[in-house]
Amino acid sequence: GYLSHPERRYPVIFAFQGIPGSVDAYQQNLPVGQIIPSLVSAQRIRDAIVVVPTVFPNNLDTECVDSADGSVRMDTFVSSDLVAWAKANLRTVDRPDAWATLGFSAGGWCSSMLTLRHPETFGYSLSLSGYFQIRFNGSALRPDGDPVYDLGRIASEQAPSVKLWFWTAKDDSAPYDSVQQFAPKVRAPTVLTVALVEAGGHSWAVWTAGTQAGLQWLGENSAQFAWVAS
């Protein structure tokens, strides 16, 4: 582990919760501190640093964006301030293919959005039942049709060199419909991989299986996350 190998640098995963929810989800419902070591033991992925920020303070639906009026700057906090903190204070591998995002539900949107908007930092996104069109549950922090956070536009016009992995149940209509609408807009070098399960709805069972599957996919698709002998 991290403390046992002070000479070693590690890839990084930024993990985002849903709303309503809390960062505790990644200890209780999706215990990445147990899931990753089990995958390391199975030689499917290497050890990684996981950073779990609060992106919905007091369940305020920020959608991880910078608001139009400047009152909320969650995008800047995560992609600039928190990234800089992690690089300065943790033994990270400083290259985009060693940085991934992970999120479920609204956190899945954050994962896809932050990776598409900041390919200089994040090379991979793992979205569990997320979506690709911004949707505020409460006050809208950005105007309708805002091009800054239009992921379809970014994927088709800018085509950042990132890999997106999307997992959902077919009977979870909002995420399923969202990825169907987004997929045709993706062009190279952006890559979208969609993994579907037949049923399960918007649930922890789906996301638990998806976390396992997504991390294995990450280990298979990034040399920086691929398993290496200790």
Label each region the model flagged.
Residues G1-S230:
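Non-catalytic cap/lid and distal C-terminal segments of serine-dependent acyl enzymes
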